[in-house]
Design a protein with these regions (language model features):
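Hydrophobic, glycine- and aromatic-enriched re-entrant/interface helices and adjoining loop segments
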Residues: 6-106, 128-131
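Membrane-water interface at transmembrane helix exits
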Residues: 23-27, 121-125, 145, 149, ...
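Hydrophobic transmembrane alpha-helices and their immediate junctions
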Residues: 103-147
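A juxtamembrane structural motif centered on a specific transmembrane helix
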Residues: 146-200
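Hydrophobic alpha-helix feature that most strongly marks membrane-spanning transmembrane helices
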Residues: 46, 66, 116-122, 126-129, ...
Length: 200
């Protein structure tokens, strides 16, 4: 029963890919990428040939990271956040962290995220049921991918995507969802088989 069902999933997946390739190749009127998406990818692939206006945000993000040095310019002393790095309080806040707190501050922030993710995985491994385990793992994967994508965009490893840095970026809905996820994780940890530090 299980093998037959898996075979149908594989056949369905292959058929979906074939249909998608046919649609993309024969129907040029279907916009796969919007113009601004194509510009972002093109400016990321052709860094030297691209007009500086299209790479303004990314270039100044790299300037901010580079000018921070090892210990940074000091908290609140960033120059790039004043109309050079647009969205410096949302998508590109990691570059301002790098400018103000330097390499040490960036490592500290990434270390805190690593500790959070490791603790979430530990909670998932000790969860009472499969739902709690999958919930904890899913939340940690989502936060880990969001952090990795944000840092990759800020360091020009990936094209600009507009993904915020959890807990640091300004934004109501993103912060609300992230804090809600932490509430779910704490609920799983409350019922998990974890060593208790306090007995209240």
């Amino acid at each position: 029963m299980g093998e037959g069902r898996a075979r149908w999933f594989v056949i369905g997946g292959i058929a979906a890919v074939i249909v998608l390739v046919i649609v993309i190749n024969f129907y040029d009127d279907i916009p796969i990428l919007k113009d601004y998406m194509a510009d972002r990818i093109g400016s990321w692939l052709n860094k030297d040939l691209t007009d500086t206006d299209k790479r303004w945000q990314t270039n100044h993000s790299l300037f901010a990271l580079g000018s921070g040095g090892f210990f940074g310019s000091g908290l609140g002393n960033s120059k790039q956040k004043y109309f050079y790095v647009s969205e410096s309080h949302t998508d590109f806040i990691f570059s301002i962290i790098g400018e103000e707190l330097g390499f040490v501050g960036c490592c500290l922030v990434l270390g805190l995220f690593a500790l959070l993710i490791l603790r979430g995985i530990y909670i998932g491994m000790r969860a009472r049921d499969r739902f709690g385990a999958l919930l904890a793992f899913g939340i940690m994967v989502q936060i880990g991918l969001q952090v990795a994508l944000n840092v990759a965009v800020v360091t020009d490893t990936l094209p600009n995507t507009g993904i915020s840095l959890p807990f640091f970026s300004y934004g109501g809905s993103s912060t609300l969802v992230t804090l809600g996820e932490m509430g779910f994780l704490l609920s799983v940890s409350r019922q998990a088989d974890l060593p208790r530090l306090y007995s209240f």
